[in-house]
Curated annotation (Swiss-Prot):
Role this protein plays: Interconverts simultaneously and stereospecifically pyruvate and lactate with concomitant interconversion of NADH and NAD(+).
GO cellular component terms listed in the entry, alphabetical order: cytosol; mitochondrion; oxidoreductase complex; sperm fibrous sheath
Keywords: Acetylation, Cytoplasm, Isopeptide bond, NAD, Oxidoreductase, Phosphoprotein, Ubl conjugation
Keyword Ribosomal protein: no
Chain positions found as N6-succinyllysine: K5, K118, K318
Record-given protein name: L-lactate dehydrogenase A chain
Subunit structure: Homotetramer. Interacts with PTEN upstream reading frame protein MP31.
Length: 332
């Protein structure tokens, strides 16, 4: 008696199952899973692989997503602590690492996470030598540098999520003040993801109308409306969310899926993301900071040259010096 499947279905060809648009997420904590669900909801991959060291949690997260397959259009969701499961990925997103504690600066995390990266990155490279690496773990700018050094990849293929979220927070808060959707509020936060990020007030606009042309004091202490508080809120917001719920996840997950979309669909959108900035703004060291980058299928193909005020440029340089001070002490 033939099996039910054979009675029902006539096979016409033996297919080789090589994924065309595979994405891997390393780390299935709150951030990794927020990235995973956001990517699944945007239909960006034909295969999603999850990797972590905690096997029970990993299998549970995979099964939970698989059980939603009817409502998704990603036909294959897999997981393992063995990196062979990640083979042939177009994009590998690293969210693994020690979690930021309440009140802990992102920079304080660094050596703990370098040691984790020394294991992860060579394994990723072994199975997907042509992938783009998207680093999300904090401190993201330093760890993007670490991933670049360990991987041996060209700099266009090693991307830090950087200030994509900082800029999104900035545009949300700006929109709240003005009663306008964040998509129509334009403004860029550049530099270090975190405490020393730089808001570029000269470029802040709605419908091409520069806010600085209406309020020349914008972003300064002399501003009666204290718009610089908007940037202060951006810097403080992660700490506040961590204090309230213990971690951040949803916004960073959505932000990462936004970057993944630009890469997987070769959109060539401009994002404030972390890239090797040596040679720009008088920076002479191998540091990664966020500047507006054109993002597509090859990763970061171009950088947009932003005109900064002398003060903004000085702040960017100071960030670079701070990061280099830490990077040159790293053991790897």
């Amino acid at each position: 008696m033939a099996a039910l499947k054979d009675q029902l279905i006539v096979n016409l060809l033996k297919e080789e199952q090589v994924p065309q648009n595979k994405i891997t997420v390393v780390g299935v904590g709150a951030v990794g899973m927020a990235c995973a669900i956001s990517i699944l909801m945007k239909d960006l991959a034909d295969e999603l692989a999850l990797v972590d060291v905690i096997e029970d949690k990993l299998k549970g997260e995979m099964m939970d997503l698989q059980h939603g397959s009817l409502f998704l259009k990603t036909p294959k969701i897999v997981s393992s602590k063995d990196y062979s499961v990640t083979a042939n990925s177009k994009l590998v997103i690293i969210t693994a690492g020690a979690r930021q504690q309440e009140g802990e600066s992102r920079l304080n995390l660094v050596q703990r996470n370098v040691n984790i990266f020394k294991f992860i990155i060579p394994n990723v490279v072994k199975y997907s030598p042509q992938c783009k690496l998207l680093i999300v773990s904090n401190p993201v700018d330093i760890l993007t540098y670490v991933a670049w050094k360990i991987s041996g990849f060209p700099k266009n293929r090693v991307i830090g999520s950087g200030c994509n979220l900082d800029s999104a927070r900035f545009r949300y808060l700006m929109g709240e003040r003005l009663g306008v959707h964040p998509l129509s509020c334009h403004g860029w936060v550049l530099g270090e993801h975190g405490d020393s990020s730089v808001p570029v007030w000269s470029g802040v606009n709605v419908a091409g109308v520069s806010l600085k042309s209406l309020n020349p004091q914008l972003g300064t202490d002399a501003d009666k409306e204290q718009w610089k508080d908007v940037h202060k809120q951006v810097v403080d917001s992660a700490y506040e969310v961590i204090k309230l719920k213990g971690y951040t996840s949803w916004a960073i997950g959505l932000s990462v899926a936004d970057l993944a979309e630009s890469i997987m669909k070769n959109l060539r959108r401009v994002h404030p993301i972390s890239t090797m900035i040596k040679g720009l703004y008088g920076i002479k060291e191998d540091v990664f900071l966020s500047v507006p980058c054109i993002l597509g299928q090859n990763g970061i193909s171009d950088v947009v040259k932003v005109t900064l005020t002398p003060d903004e440029e000085a702040r960017l340089k100071k960030s670079a010096d701070t990061l280099w001070g830490i990077q040159k002490e790293l053991q790897f």
